[in-house]
A protein has these predicted regions:
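Non-catalytic, solvent-exposed interaction/assembly segments
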Residues: 1-125
């Protein structure tokens, strides 16, 4: 099963057929600022690449933002067989906000137990 996150205009859309999810929420100037801060942290050697506690914190912040008030990730994971495939997409000619979204280090997604990519049962890809 694939969980698809895509940017359409000024909205983040989620589609996960198996979980019955087809929802969207607006993207705001605050989201753009948040994306810039996360990318800056990720590319800062003292706070990103080589600093595992900082990478874990960033992964948890990304998870919390993507999950949102509606619990998108939790609801998708609840029905996901392994491997849990998550796809991030934007339009063919992305604007600045979409580029930032697509550049985020989604491989770092983490919950309270750690990085999702390290969960052998989930097999997040």
């Amino acid at each position: 099963m694939t969980t698809l996150f895509r940017i359409e205009s000024d909205r983040l859309c989620l589609r996960c057929g198996q979980a019955g999810l087809d929802e969207s929420r607006p993207l705001t100037a605050a989201d753009e600022s948040r994306f810039r801060g996360w990318l800056q942290d990720y590319h800062n050697p003292s706070r990103g690449y080589g600093n595992e506690p900082a990478r874990l914190r960033l992964g948890r912040e990304l998870y919390a933002w993507l999950d949102g008030d509606a619990g998108w990730l939790a609801r998708s994971r609840a029905t996901a067989p392994a491997p849990w495939i998550v796809d991030f997409r934007g339009p063919r000619d992305p604007d600045g906000l979409t580029r930032l979204f697509l550049q985020l280090p989604w491989e770092l997604l983490a919950d309270d137990r750690g990085h999702l990519a390290a969960d052998l049962a989930l097999r997040y890809t």
